[in-house]
Amino acid sequence: MSKKKRTASSTRWLKEHFDDKYVQQAQKQGLRSRAVFKIDEIQQKDKLIKQGMTVVDLGAAPGGWSQFCVEQVGPHGRVIACDILPMDPIAGVDFLQGDFREEAVLSALLGRVGEQKVDIILSDMAPNMSGTPAVDQPRSMYLVELALEMCKQVLAAKGSFVVKVFQGAGFEEYLKEVRSLFSVVKIRKPDSSRSRSREVYIVATGFKL
């Protein structure tokens, strides 16, 4: 049987991907994904991650953000990561594979966190995109709501939250909720974020317990 022909959109995506300077840089530097440049840019601007901190990384696979965070927190810090997809081990990262939307997975993740509060929660989660905004946007907003709920459970006073959000239905309401829970809230569009993508990162600091 012959392979199905690629669609025009998938061919365009592949060309964009392999021509992408951040993809090329990630490969040259032995990084797990181009996404590391997003968190690196946020870190350079906002200086959120420090030595000895405890970080939770949601939507971690293939591990670019976790790889970056381990270097930032050092030997006395902790990085706890979760993703529905498998992830090759990273020294210093406690990884849980599972669907964050499931209660059992959330309970297991909270068990990994333990009694100590978390300094930063990072979420780069995104649903499998169907290409239909009326389907994709609610799925995306559900994930970011779950990430915010986790903040309410485990984030330390004055802690930080970085979350990828797609602009669209529910975005303004979500932003308002985040602003009610944190002292300072900024919206970042990293240079490495593809210009035609609706994604932005909400960077929130000063969690109010």
UniProtKB/Swiss-Prot annotation:
This is Ribosomal RNA large subunit methyltransferase E. It comes from the Bacteria. The keyword Glycoprotein does not apply. Its EC number is 2.1.1.166. NCBIfam families: PRK11188.1, rrmJ. It is found in: Cytoplasm. It catalyses: uridine(2552) in 23S rRNA + S-adenosyl-L-methionine = 2'-O-methyluridine(2552) in 23S rRNA + S-adenosyl-L-homocysteine + H(+).
